Amino acid sequence: MIKRCSKLLLTSVLLSPYLFADTTKVEQKSPKPVFETVWQKIYGGEDDDVAKGIVMLENGDNAVIGTCKSFNAERSDICVTRITADGATRWRKLLGGKKQDQGVAITRAKDGNLLILGSGKSFNDNADKDLYVAKLSLDGKLIWEKSFGGNRDEYAGGIAGMNNGGVMVVGDTESFSKKGYKDIYIIMLDKNGNEISKRTIGGKLNDEAKSLTRTADGNFMMVGAREVNRSGDSDFFLMKLDQQGKKIWAKTLGQNEHDVLNAVTPTPDGGIVATGSTRSYYSQQTDLAVMYFNKNGKLIWFKIYGFKYYDEGNAVTMTKDGNYLVAGKTNSMGKGDFDNYLLALDPKGKLIWSKVYGERNKDIAHGITRTSDGSIVVVGESDSYKRPKDFYMIKLK
């Protein structure tokens, strides 16, 4: 039963699919239960509220980022909420201005405080979007905030803390693209949010950074997509960066349809597991894709999970027993237009558990984290339990 809370030009390597290590379209069965649902909750007010990301804190707490139109927001604000292990709200902080602003990603700085990434139109005098970066204390106090952009739109992708206390931010830029399309935008900040350096990466068409994580070997991994034709088709894209934001290696892989990576998580050996969606590889429409690369950029396995319609991975994390849990959306299964789609994979990418959560309308998972007690919390959006949209949260153990 769900409870409602009222508080509330680039060098890359193109890989032929025949060179892929263990590229598999998986026929799904019904694996034995691996996770149990602890609780499901929705949080929201009188208008749309959507959760996009989550990060683990101490004592079972978590911090969630999203976009809120409720809670006395202006048009829409970046919304950061700290929740307890049982899903209660400790505090909520709204960030932004008088225009439309969106929260995209959240992580922790070296000193343990919260790093916030969003984008919005409140940070300049025109109607264009800028990147927004902020640092909050663990009790929700604003330490600093900065915005970055030009005379066109910028789009937020991912954020990570650095060894020196600084911040790496990735996203997309139209302002600083030489070709008139989106280029990947990488910004390095010091511990006080001051810009140290920035650079763009791109080809002749759109290039997008969707997510960023720190790897176990102290570097960073960025994932996204590179457009391959003017019809909008794209390839999976990955780039490993060092602490100075310089490229260690990059990979582009895909076929003749739309392939994109939305999220990435580190593995203990310095590699990564990434998830997204594909319309290639004999997909019937759009399927959920998951892949594992080692620290040197070698593709170890690549799995595709999907049914007749639309299935997509939006978030991924490692579980306490060394498996991986992917969260996303599906309209191939379930009761509504879209439902939350959760899959557990073993270290070799084999499906060991899956479950669909949702009701009659749209329920979509956007973020996932492992908590300090080893549980899993998934966040996203729902308009199945009331209109308009609310934060939707699921805790598993």
Model-based region annotation:
Residues 22-397:
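A sequence-level/structural motif corresponding to short, flexible coil/turn segments enriched
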Residues 1-9:
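Bacterial N-terminal signal peptides that target proteins for export
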Residues 10-17:
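Bacterial N-terminal signal peptides
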